[in-house]
Amino acid sequence: FITLLLRKFICSITKKC
């Protein structure tokens, strides 16, 4: 599963980490 990449992608867009 690629949850880390997905979360990183969302983090980059929403600026919420």
Curated annotation (Swiss-Prot):
Belongs to the frog skin active peptide (FSAP) family. Brevinin subfamily. GO terms for biological process: defense response to bacterium; killing of cells of another organism. Transmembrane segments: none annotated. This is Brevinin-1Ta. Keywords: Amphibian defense peptide, Antibiotic, Antimicrobial, Cytolysis, Disulfide bond, Hemolysis, Secreted. Expressed by the skin glands. The keyword ATP-binding does not apply. GO terms for cellular component: extracellular region. It is found in: Secreted. Its main location: secreted. Antibacterial activity against representative Gram-negative and Gram-positive bacteria and exhibits a very high hemolytic activity. It comes from Rana temporaria (European common frog). Disulfide bonds join 11-17.
